[in-house]
Structure formats: structure tokens, C-alpha cells
Amino acid sequence: MGEQVIVLTDLTKQYGNFTAVDHIRLNIRKGEIFGLLGPNGAGKSTTILMMLGLTEPTSGTVEICGINSTTHPIEVKRRIGYLPEDVGFYDDMTGPENLIYTARLNGISDKEAKTKALELMKRVGLEDQLAKKTGKYSRGMRQRLGLADVLIKNPEIIILDEPTSGIDPAGVQEFIELLR
């Protein structure tokens, strides 16, 4: 396998006397697929937020592609595609319009953004929903669009936080197939 792209060293997060994350050590190499498993409240989402540079650890370090996420969170965010548990889109915009907006925020030209948006809508099985406003999308459709939103900036690392939550069993199977 390749170089280490995610390195957590003694990562800890405390809220007062409560320890949400307790000295995690983790190394993930390029090309690996890794899952954080545990019950509700185990610190999975908190760990992800620290990896993204959105929450500062109490102690320990996070390096993403060799960059410290606490001291350089914007640079880390440029390299990561993140799909949160509850995906948010502009409900009055179509799927492609939301994707193009994300692409523009990431410095992708209008021409390339439009091309990639249409390609990704097809890839995630939403090619027949091009004119539909995302406010009318089902939960499964929003998750699919969320995956397209993650992929449009061609990230080095993809982090998914409970990507199949609230999706019916058939939809879960379809979503897993999209990830392959």
C-alpha cells in the first residue's frame, strides 16, 4: 500500500470531565477503506470533526496528507470530501445547480463544473432528476447527491459519516454499489 494519508496520534477530546475520544492512535494508508464502529456516543463523529479541523482536540494530533488539521484546517478541507450524516443542500436549486455551486467554491471552472455535474448525476443514478429541486428529493436521493457533491472536487480522501442512515435496505445496497 501507499503512504500514510491519515495519522491520528494520541487524539483526545474532553468536554469538561467527559472524555469523548480517548488517546486514539490510527494510521490509514492511501487506498485503504477504514470504518469507525461503535455505539452512539462512542466519539466517532467527534473524531471525524477533529480530522476535518472543525473541532480542536484537547490533546494529540491529526495529520491529513502530512498536514496538521488543527493548524491548517482550510488546506485539509481542500483535500477531503466529507459527507455528513445529514446532507444539506439548497432546496430551491436542482441537483446539478447544487453540484455546480460546490464546484465553483472549489475553484473549478464553470465549463468543467457543468460537465462534471452532469457526469456525476448519471454516475449516482440521478440522471432522470436533473430538473427537480433538491427540496423534493427523498432521503436516498439526497444521499446519492451528497456522494456526487463529495466527488465533484476530486478529493484525495473521502470521509462518510453514517452515509446509509435512514435509507431503506434496497437503497443501502444501491449506495454501497456506488462506492465501489
Locate the predicted segments by residue.
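Conserved ABC ATPase signature
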Residues: K133-Y137
